Amino acid sequence: MDSDEGYNYEFDDEEEECSEDSGEEETADDTLELGEVELVDPVVAGGERDDCGETGGSGLGPGQDEEDYRFEVLTAEQILQHMVECIREVNEVIQNPATITRILLSHFNWDKEKLMERYFDGNLDKLFSECHVINPSKKSRTRLMNTRSSAQDMPCQICYLNYPNSYFTGLECGHKFCMQCWGDYLTTKIIEEGMGQTISCPAHSCDILVDDNTVMRLITDSKVKLKYQHLITNSFVECNRLLKWCPAPDCHHVVKVQYPDAKPVRCKCGRQFCFNCGENWHDPVKCKWLRKWIKKCDDDSETSNWIAANTKECPKCHVTIEKDGGCNHMVCRNQNCKAEFCWVCLGPWEPHGSAWYNCNRYNEDDAKAARDAQERSRAALQRYLFYCNRYMNHMQSLRFEHKLYAQVKQKMEEMQQHNMSWIEVQFLKKAVDVLCQCRSTLMFTYVFAFYLKKNNQSIIFENNQADLENATEVLSGYLERDISQDSLQDIKQKVQDKYRYCESRRRVLLQHVHEGYDKDLWEYIED
């Protein structure tokens, strides 16, 4: 390419008009067009609109400097420019139309080196065939179906309605259809099927892909164009290990890092998440165990544990039975079974006597094994509920703590009316920030503890956890109750002392956990 104009993404409105088709083959344009569509740069979650990439560091890891993990927040427009730059770099070597190069790069998951290697291995026909495009260096051997004059109507092979020849268009494969059918076909593929880079020619058994210029020329709805643009850019982001979409709803920003790692990044919308897994930042638990925990909470594994802990199987027909009374004399309600057995030992009821319960098989090995299995299930359920309840409690408290900002703002305004400067009252906002950080950390410590085997280091961890939890509750009490009762100086002294202590204990806890990671001190329970 001779100039940057060949990579212009803006769509020329004049190209929307149907041009006269003289019957000659359509030639590929060098311009890669993804539409003159307004890209949404939303303001969500209290974020500020900014047209420039935002850079920053996490600054949240224990003992880490903010420069340790650098990242940049990009808008959708900037992602498009990254795509353009990638295509430009490749086309400086292979000299193909930009739309064709985009399809080639998509086929190789935007791996420029891999594309270059295949491109110069000497078998271009095979490469273009695998990528489902016509080699632009060769003229199509299939003549477009223009045997009739432009004045004569011809039937569309999709809707079978007659239109002038000028109302038809097609790809290099030679298949032509009317403009209306093309538009409907592309809209269905994009909106209903969510297809972007893999839309093929609508002709039967034709796998030639539709290029970006054709899509943008034949679609008139700006919403469909925007959706197509998002699908193309999403493919670019998903294939790039240094890019990650912000997981916040309706946020169109992308975070770019210098190297991929399980580190915290913060989008301009305010969402902080783990770059590795995309979940909310979850220090100190690792991504592997958080995924297992989320799956455990979402699936029916604990329902199965409850069934195992609170029901038993009939020893004869194996139907599940729940005890609904105090008597241990059980009668199976299965009409084809009617077995009578003892709830305690699962043995036949007849040897137990008819006058009073007398379980003479209580110590039998098979009965003991059955009871042990039930006890294990009950213990597993109780253990899960112990950690899950505390995890959910801190999650709920964290939601409530966010409401404190409004209350604190009001108190800060009151303090400023009592001869305190704006800077002097910032300790309240800082305290709420620390409180929310501690809640989040404590929430994920229970996930970490659930999979942690007991040893000397785990005891130290639990002591640190208990200390931080106690300090966090005290700080929360100061902010929720004492903030409206005590004198201004008393409030400031108590709150500052406590949030600094919370910061210190949180740092100690995280440093201990990460030290355990570094020295391989932790042993885990494989669930």
From Swiss-Prot:
InterPro entries: Ariadne, ARIH1-like_UBL, E3_UB_ligase_RBR, IBR_dom, TRIAD_supradom, Znf_RING, Znf_RING/FYVE/PHD. It catalyses: [E2 ubiquitin-conjugating enzyme]-S-ubiquitinyl-L-cysteine + [acceptor protein]-L-lysine = [E2 ubiquitin-conjugating enzyme]-L-cysteine + [acceptor protein]-N(6)-ubiquitinyl-L-lysine. Residues 378-527 are annotated as: Ariadne domain. Zn(2+) 1 binds at residues 156, 159, 178, 181. One of its GO terms (biological process) is ubiquitin-dependent protein catabolic process. Its main location: cytoplasm. It is found in: Cytoplasm; Nucleus. Residues 152-363 are annotated as: TRIAD supradomain. A zinc finger (RING-type) spans 156-206, 314-345. A zinc finger (IBR-type) spans 226-287. Pathway: Protein modification; protein ubiquitination. Gene3D superfamilies: 1.20.120.1750, Zinc/RING finger domain, C3HC4 (zinc finger) (3.30.40.10). Zn(2+) 5 binds at residues 314, 317, 332, 337. Residues 75-123 are annotated as: UBA-like. Its EC number is 2.3.2.31. Residues 1-66 are annotated as: Disordered. The keyword Nucleus applies. Residues 1-39 have a biased composition (Acidic residues). The active site is at residue 327. E3 ubiquitin-protein ligase, which catalyzes ubiquitination of target proteins together with ubiquitin-conjugating enzyme E2 ube2l3. Acts as an atypical E3 ubiquitin-protein ligase by working together with cullin-RING ubiquitin ligase (CRL) complexes and initiating ubiquitination of CRL substrates: associates with CRL complexes and specifically mediates addition of the first ubiquitin on CRLs targets. The initial ubiquitin is then elongated. E3 ubiquitin-protein ligase activity is activated upon binding to neddylated cullin-RING ubiquitin ligase complexes. Members of the RBR family are atypical E3 ligases. They interact with the E2 conjugating enzyme UBE2L3 and function like HECT-type E3 enzymes: they bind E2s via the first RING-type zinc finger, but require an obligate trans-thiolation step during the ubiquitin transfer, requiring a conserved active site Cys residue in the second RING-type zinc finger. The active site probably forms a thioester intermediate with ubiquitin taken from the active-site cysteine of the E2 before ultimately transferring it to a Lys residue on the substrate. The Ariadne domain inhibits activity by masking the second RING-type zinc finger that contains the active site. This is E3 ubiquitin-protein ligase arih1.
